[in-house]
Swiss-Prot record:
This is Ribosomal RNA small subunit methyltransferase C. Belongs to the methyltransferase superfamily. RsmC family. GO terms for molecular function: 16S rRNA (guanine(1207)-N(2))-methyltransferase activity; nucleic acid binding. Keywords: Cytoplasm, Methyltransferase, rRNA processing, S-adenosyl-L-methionine, Transferase. Monomer.
């Protein structure tokens, strides 16, 4: 995280204005500017575990990871710098949470790429902190206002749910496929064999739909789910509970917090981090799977057909199969063999 994002570069044009400020950084924190900007004091709150990992190395306890920020997370801050995400409901959840905690009179800065829809911050905050655009550069907008009224925030009002073949899926803003089962996951589910047994790890679990659908027709599997997203972790826990299915769910940057080996690893890996295209997570998943699969164990993932995963699979496992495909998606399978162990 040495290079700054365009949004951070816009903020740096105003760095002198922040030297005496006690700043809370929040939102889509994709670089380490919160740890490096010269301020009177800096805190950071993120819902993304991998962003917290980077920031906490430099900021210690002043970097926090959780679904909902608390009063302790914003203590003594007189300025909010909020990085607008690509998902408007996610921004609303986070901003209403933060503004309900910060004192009236707090300086509010919102920055983001134009293509992310940052302009809608003006309307969203109109009743609480009227914003004006103060800079435009690097295809980003920077908005400033002052908190005039604290909103009432109730996290429970942001929950949603949908049904898939009789299963209840619980969702929150920022969770992948929040409004329904995506086509890629549907294709992957179609390949899962009933009456499977053993330990299954669902990496990048989202709302937990892959795991609960798998467990319904294979009740003897033992489930572990992980995701970098705090909303996804909470949504998966709620989805498991709603369907009476047991499983361990925790935050992890791919395998960073995963212990032990599994008989199967399933995933619909992300290839976007915020507004940026990133294949890092999927490549880390493929390369790291050999350290978390039992002999004869299987990695099964779905991905957009154009993504360059076959080479990484062959390089890591020695071979791969395409077991299902459509015009847009492919389901890949790779088996843990002696050949893979040498990789």
């Amino acid at each position: 995280m040495s290079a700054f994002t365009p949004a951070s570069e816009v903020l740096l044009r105003h760095s002198d204005d922040f030297e005496q400020s006690r700043i809370l950084f929040a939102g889509d924190l994709q670089d380490d500017l919160p740890a490096r900007l010269d301020t009177a004091a800096s805190r950071a709150h993120t819902q993304q575990f991998h962003h917290w990992q980077v920031l906490s190395r430099q900021m210690g306890d002043n970097a926090r990871f959780s679904l909902v920020a608390t009063a302790n997370d914003v203590a003594d801050c007189d300025t909010l710098i909020y990085y607008w995400p690509k998902n408007k409901p996610e921004a609303q959840f986070q901003l209403m949470n933060l503004l309900s905690l910060l004192p009236v009179g707090t300086d509010i800065f919102v920055v983001g790429e134009n293509r992310s829809g940052v302009r809608s911050a003006e309307q969203m905050l109109a009743d609480y902190a009227p914003l004006n655009k103060v800079d435009s550069a690097r295809r980003c907008g920077l908005y400033f206002g002052r908190l005039e009224k604290q909103p009432v925030f109730d996290a429970n009002k942001f929950w949603g749910e949908y049904n898939v073949d009789g299963l209840t899926v619980k969702t929150l803003p920022g969770v992948f496929s929040r409004d329904g089962l995506d086509v890629g996951s549907q294709l992957l589910l179609s390949t899962l064999t009933p009456h499977t047994k053993g330990k299954v790890l669902d990496v990048g679990c989202g709302a937990g739909v892959l795991s609960v659908a798998f467990a319904r027709h294979s009740p003897k599997i033992r489930l572990t789910l992980c995701d970098v997203s705090a909303p996804a972790v909470e949504a998966s826990r709620a989805t498991l509970a709603a369907n009476g299915i047991e499983g361990e769910v925790f935050a992890s940057n791919v395998f960073s917090e995963v212990k032990g080996r599994f008989d199967m690893i399933i995933s619909n890996p992300p290839f976007h981090d915020g507004m940026q295209t990133s294949l890092d997570a999927a490549q880390t998943l493929i390369r790291g799977a050999v350290r978390h699969l039992n002999s004869g164990g299987e990695l099964r993932i779905v991905a957009n057909a154009f993504l360059p995963y076959p080479d990484v699979l062959d390089e890591t496992f020695g071979f791969h199969e395409v077991i299902a495909q459509t015009g847009r998606f492919k389901v890949y399978r790779a088996i843990m063999t002696r050949q893979a162990k040498k990789g």
